[in-house]
Amino acid sequence: MQNSHMDEYRNSSNGSTGNSSEVVVEHPTDFSTEIMNVTEMEQSPDDSPNVNASTEETEMASAVDLPVTLTETEANFPPEYEKFWKTVENNPQDFTGWVYLLQYVEQENHLMAARKAFDRFFIHYPYCYGYWKKYADLEKRHDNIKPSDEVYRRGLQAIPLSVDLWIHYINFLKETLDPGDPETNNTIRGTFEHAVLAAGTDFRSDRLWEMYINWENEQGNLREVTAIYDRILGIPTQLYSHHFQRFKEHVQNNLPRDLLTGEQFIQLRRELASVNGHSGDDGPPGDDLPSGIEDITDPAKLITEIENMRHRIIEIHQEMFNYNEHEVSKRWTFEEGIKRPYFHVKPLEKAQLKNWKEYLEFEIENGTHERVVVLFERCVISCALYEEFWIKYAKYMENHSIEGVRHVFSRACTIHLPKKPMVHMLWAAFEEQQGNINEARNILKTFEECVLGLAMVRLRRVSLERRHGNLEEAEHLLQDAIKNAKSNNESSFYAVKLARHLFKIQKNLPKSRKVLLEAIERDKENTKLYLNLLEMEYSGDLKQNEENILNCFDKAVHGSLPIKMRITFSQRKVEFLEDFGSDVNKLLNAYDEHQTLLKEQDSLKRKAENGSEEPEEKKAHTEDTTSSSTQMIDGDLQANQAVYNYSAWYQYNYQNPWNYGQYYPPPPT
């Protein structure tokens, strides 16, 4: 009997609905879908028993759900409203500006101004549960009960794990629903069920469970109370021991037949009769066993029977409690490390971030899928502005639910992290994996329009088009990047990318050469352009490309590069003619030209020694350039790959998992 109860507990500790005289256990087929439904409010109070919104309510919900833009009404807004509004309109990430705006509209008690402010605020910060409460209270103060109810529903859709918001909403229902309406209790019970489904597995959800138990006690529904305890005693929570103590009081203070369903009561009596060897008049076995204990006429036996049943009920739940206590002990240290379980724009301490990472790893390794998802949901409230946790969440969901992955990415990118590139790029990559090429294309395009100038995003768009055979579009994207570049360096960077695309992918050497030559005309001091042009020419028929290669060398040697770089290119020109040249005269001329450059360098050195040294700033820049470029040129140019760091176009100091730090790796030494 003990083992069967324990197995039942492990499989269904959180499944009882508590809505009937018997314990009904339901198992969602896919908790990924279940929690997704909760966060989308498909499991909203709207679906509670006997809660049917009228057409008027639906229209009001739509009106409240959208930002209010009533031009005529805005003329009558409070005098300082426009000042506060402009601050957040110009910078929606100014959280302090939002706080001042919301405080102002609350003080002014201007409903339309408040609606506009709150509606816009929640587009950016839906996890601020306290402001949902303020908004709902504001509507209620104006006797707008239906809009107030709708605000609560929207808040619970945005943050379904908020125990506080659920409690506030249930209290709101208790205050506003008609106690004389026979459907009121069903509505409240249905809301309690949605609350514990969404937030009941939170380690700090004890107040919600206590509230549910107390309410059922007030209604005199002792069997419902027992059903709730059957669930909470199997969930690791902060006050797990307190719940067990209250459960024992519940059992001791009430008769077993009032605590259990008829089926449970009969099963328990049979078990006790079997253990005690009862037969005949003491306890008719089999189907003839009565549902009550009225057949026991001896008061002493009656008391003994009741106490035995109470003892057995507690014994069964003691085993559940012991198992749960073990689960709590494994998580206690992690839970103590969570100092800020709610959302805030201020950065979290490193210790708390580390604690979240370790807690998630522990739960992934040891917990059920349901517990992992709930912990992730808790984590992305506290760490909503840290894309690493959203990415980790999405990666975890890949093995459980494709729609779940999409749901996580969508929430992260469209609400909490609209300007973080990595999570958008991973979302696009995920959609591409699923064959949703247009969706991947739109994600990258939309993000690039939101955050301009990120090379990593433009290159991802190019590679997406290339992978799917849209070579002209890939070329167009690079040409557009060159055209709209903010500097010569940026333009040259994209020119190299375009040239290599044309040469390696489209096999169009003349067009590739033209791109680099035009780039050199714009940016004559950029060593990387010459290197890439040479590498490209070296990749073809050297005899056929001899003139083009020599022209490239001449551009570098006679151009505006530092003397040290010009000498290096000159030396490589001599080596090229020595190894592959067809005209000895060109070789001799190149040698003479090289000697002239060496003399020029000696002359500059003597001037520097005599006090005519070039400005320190320019010298530092020159040495920087020549040092890095010389390293690239040393060795076989055919193997050389031009290094080009474009971290200047990466904002936010992102570490790039695709190692975009260089154009091409340098040759092995």
UniProtKB/Swiss-Prot annotation:
Membrane-spanning parts: none
Major subcellular location class: nucleus
InterPro entries the record matches: HAT, TPR-like_helical_dom_sf
Modified residues (Phosphoserine): 44
UniProt keyword Cell membrane present: no
Region of interest (Disordered), ranges: 1-23, 599-634
Compositional bias (Low complexity): 11-23
Subcellular location, record wording: Nucleus
UniProt KW keywords: mRNA processing, mRNA splicing, Nucleus, Phosphoprotein, Repeat
A biological process from GO: mRNA 5'-splice site recognition
Family affiliation: Belongs to the PRP39 family.
UniProt function note: Involved in pre-mRNA splicing.
Full protein name: Pre-mRNA-processing factor 39
Taxonomic source organism: Homo sapiens
